[in-house]
Amino acid sequence: MKRLLIILLVFASTLKFVSAQEDWSWWNDAHGWESGDPGWRNWLIISPAYLGPNALPVPELKKGFIEEYMEFELAVSNHFLSGDPTQDISGRVYIPFAQNKIAVEMYGVFFEHYAYTEEIRDERFSRDENGKGYAIGDFYFSTHIQLFKNRAFPNTMFRAILKTASGTNFEGARYADTPAYSFDFSFSKNYGSPESLLFRPHAMLGFYSWQTNDELNLQNDALLYGAGADFQKNNWSFTPSFSGYLGYKNNGDRPMQLNFELRKEYNKKAISIKYQHGLHDWLYKTVRFSFIWKLNGIE
C-alpha cells in the first residue's frame, strides 16, 4: 500500500511538471502576446460569433401555451460551418403540471465533437492547438407559467431560463464558462382546426443576459425576439420561424437565424426534423433529428 501511494505521488508530480512545461509559444506568436499582457482568458470573446454552436444559442421560440403532455426528447445534431463542423447529442425533459398552468423544462448537450481549422482557432483565440476534441455542454433549467389561454386575448405564456456554467473546454472556445439567464413572453392565436388546417401565428419578446470576461462590463444584455407560425394538419405540423437577440456590445453578440421544423405525432410519440440557418453572428447550418416520448402531465 505504501509503495502504491509513492507511485501515485510520483505520477501526479510528473503530470504536474509536464503540464507546467507545456509550450504555448504558438499561441503567443499567433496573437502577439508578450509578458505583462492580460492573461489568455481575457482574450476570448464571450459572444456567439466566437464560440461553438451550442455556447450561447438563441432560446427556442415558444408558442404562448403550455403543452399538454410530458415529453422526453433525445436529439442528434449536425452543425455545418466551413472550418468548424460540429456534431452533438442532446436531451430535453418537459414536465407540465397544475392542470397545465405551470411547466418546467430541462435540457442540454450531453456530448459534442468538433474539428476546426487553424483559421477558426486563431480567430477565436482558442488554446486548443490541433482544434479537434470533445466537450460537454451547458445545462438549462426553465419555468413556464400560463397567463392566458383560449380567450379573446391571445394565448400568453411567461418563461424564465437559467443557464449553468457546466460546459467544458472554455480554453478551446467551445463554451462560455459563465452563467446566463433570460425571460420572455410568447403569444399565439389559433385559426381553423387540425382536422382541416390549423394556422397558429406566434411571437416572442424578452430579455437575455450573460456574464462576460470584460472587466469594465461584466454583463452583456440583449433584446430577445422571434416570430413564426404553425401549419397543422391532423398529426403533421410544419413550423417556419425566425429568432435572435440583440446584444448591446455589438461584438458578435447579435445572432439571427431562420428555423424550420417538420413534426409527426403518433401513439404518444413524435419525431421531429429541424433545420436552422444562421443569418448573422451565428452562421452555422444545423440539421437536428429528434425522437420524443410523451406521457400524461402531472395534475
Stretches found by the model and what they are:
Residues 128-132, 165-176, 208-216:
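Surface-exposed cleft-lining segments at the edges of enzyme active sites
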Residues 176-247:
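Detector for outer-membrane/organellar transmembrane beta-barrel domains
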Residues 82-86, 132-138, 174-180, 196, ...:
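Transmembrane beta-barrel outer-membrane domains
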Residues 21-164, 181-188, 192, 236-240, ...:
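Transmembrane beta-barrel domains of Gram-negative outer membranes and organellar outer membranes
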Residues 1-25:
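Bacterial Sec-dependent N-terminal signal peptides
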Residues 79-81, 111-113, 161-167, 206-212, ...:
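Structural signature of outer-membrane beta-barrel domains
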Residues 84, 103, 116, 151-153, ...:
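Short acidic, gly/pro-rich beta-turn/loop elements at beta-sheet edges
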Residues 117, 127-128, 216-217, 223-299:
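Outer membrane beta-barrel transmembrane domains
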